[in-house]
Amino acid sequence: MSTAALVEGKIVQCIGAVIDVEFPRDSMPKIYDALILDGSELTLEVQQQLGDGVVRTICLGASDGLRRGLTVKNTAKPISVPVGKPTLGRIMDVLGRPIDEAGPIESEHTRSIHQKAPAFDELSPSTELLETGIKVIDLICPFAKGGKVGLFGGAGVGKTVNMMELINNIAKEHGGYSVFAGVGERTREGNDFYHEMKDSNVLDKVALVYGQMNEPPGNRLRVALTGLTMAEHFRDEGLDVLFFVDNIYRFTLAGTEVSALLGRMPSAVGYQPTLAEEMGKLQERITSTKKGSITSVQAVYVPADDLTDPSPATTFGHLDATVVLSRDIASLGIYPAVDPLDSTSRQIDPNVIGEEHYTITRRVQQTLQRYKELRDIIAILGMDELSPEDKLSVARARKIQRFLSQPFHVAEVFTGSPGKYVPLKETIRGFKMIVDGECDHLPEQAFYMVGTIDEAFEKAKKIQ
């Protein structure tokens, strides 16, 4: 469409990131239309029609220097971003513009960031397991190919490091394309992630979309949709794609900010009244169809470690597997700090993962649960008051707890020990030996920060 044909309007009010624009009454923009400020690249997205030709928009960029009376043009279509192979290896912003100073993105195709979720009869369920090489995840909450996974945790328990390790293990082994959406996280993490991908030579298979903490709420709200749109395009071309979001909570938070600016009444804990709908719109699109699959891993910040907060609670219902990171476990120095009793997966079913894996997982959880129940007694009366069976349970539980830790490739700088990738068979064999009592003679330190059970035996020899 030529710029001459664009309908023009005038700014009539600016309140922070919310801009009201007046258009001729017979040519008002539609909801979600993108408007462009004349003479600049600043984009506004229509959120409400107030009547009398006035629309209320949210600004996707800094609103510094805006004033009443400036001319705005209506593009008469929603925000569209480049999709396809030219986006791989590039860093883009919410509007799909490159921010890596490596020239323009030469993409033939663009796609609107607002898409309908696939119809129910187009969906394709999957039960094929996705091996991550992380013992605690493969054993307790295995991932499905084409499934949705959430990493839940408070501040500083290791969501981003866990996600980086998953990307490192899956993206390298997987060989397909990945899309990473950095939603309202630290720019430092975005930079680290870029270099991590570059150093491991998988950058040419990853599209990076960033709307970081320092950006206006409009950008943070829409950047998840931008990344998802790119992932959907690869899926619709018949590919299996990985979609990583860090952090889905910031998406909700940006929605809360926008909602308040638009003058909506807040609901529980001050969140937007449309929380469930906004989350549903995003999550229903992250799905696998008969054409291709999207396997998504989402980090979910848990405010004040409260899993019943409306934001994480709304996210729970959409996921196939939940990995809960616990501050108590992190404080023991056990990393990844995954809580084996709180984390769950829909794949934990003997018909899906097999009888042996299912039995071992349940036995490990029973042992840990028994230890949890006995902890108060031990704190008051000491170990001597326990029955011989309980003493054995506690000893095994402590070994299991330590064996659930693992050195990560992406954390080699901090730990000083090389990262370990543990195949699922080895994970099952190791935990089977512990619960069967074949490792009762080994000291519990031998199980800390090792890969396979054989390494624990080697470490025990050095200790003794």
From Swiss-Prot:
Keywords: ATP synthesis, ATP-binding, Cell inner membrane, Cell membrane, CF(1), Hydrogen ion transport, Ion transport, Membrane, Nucleotide-binding, Translocase, Transport. One of its GO terms (molecular function) is ATP binding. SMART domains: AAA. CDD domains: ATP-synt_F1_beta_C, ATP-synt_F1_beta_N, F1-ATPase_beta_CD. HAMAP family: ATP_synth_beta_bact. F-type ATPases have 2 components, CF(1) - the catalytic core - and CF(0) - the membrane proton channel. CF(1) has five subunits: alpha(3), beta(3), gamma(1), delta(1), epsilon(1). CF(0) has three main subunits: a(1), b(2) and c(9-12). The alpha and beta chains form an alternating ring which encloses part of the gamma chain. CF(1) is attached to CF(0) by a central stalk formed by the gamma and epsilon chains, while a peripheral stalk is formed by the delta and b chains. This is ATP synthase subunit beta. The lineage of its organism: Bacteria, Pseudomonadati, Pseudomonadota, Betaproteobacteria, Burkholderiales. The gene is atpD.
